[in-house]
Design a protein with these regions (language model features):
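GNAT-family acyltransferases
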Residues: 1-98, 111, 115, 119
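Glycine-rich acyl-CoA binding loop
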Residues: 101-106
Length: 121
């Protein structure tokens, strides 16, 4: 486990999560900021990138799991982005549409922010 909140815990994504995460990545609505749903090949590449980032950086997007049911409902974590020629850390998230509008994204993002400042700083 990476971090937790009252309702959620965040952990590294594993191959066992592939189908759940692929469902999110292949949902046009969930992927609106990425110009649409991912192909099977893009999903596989996404997973490969996550595993590489865990090994090289020690962080990336993590599985967001409901404590009550142990169900993976999305992914949230820290990513590095290029902004005006500078590398900056951002919090990103993607959730299964069935779990939108319940405050999970905000809750997970706040936990990631705390983790970034308390653990990675």
């Amino acid at each position: 486990m990476i971090t937790e909140t009252k309702r959620l815990y965040l952990r590294e994504i594993t191959q066992a999560d592939y189908a759940v995460i692929a469902k999110i990545l292949q949902d046009d609505d969930a992927m609106f900021a990425y110009n649409g749903a991912f192909s099977d090949e893009e999903v596989a590449q996404w997973f490969d990138n996550l595993m590489t980032q865990y090994q090289t950086r020690g962080f990336s997007l993590w599985a967001v799991v409901l404590k009550e049911t142990d169900q993976v409902v999305g992914q949230c974590g820290l990513t590095l982005q290029q902004v005006q020629g500078e590398t900056v850390t951002e919090i990103g998230y993607l959730f299964n549409r069935d779990y939108w509008h319940q405050g999970y994204a905000i809750e997970a993002a706040q936990a990631c922010k705390t983790y970034a400042f308390d653990v990675l700083s």
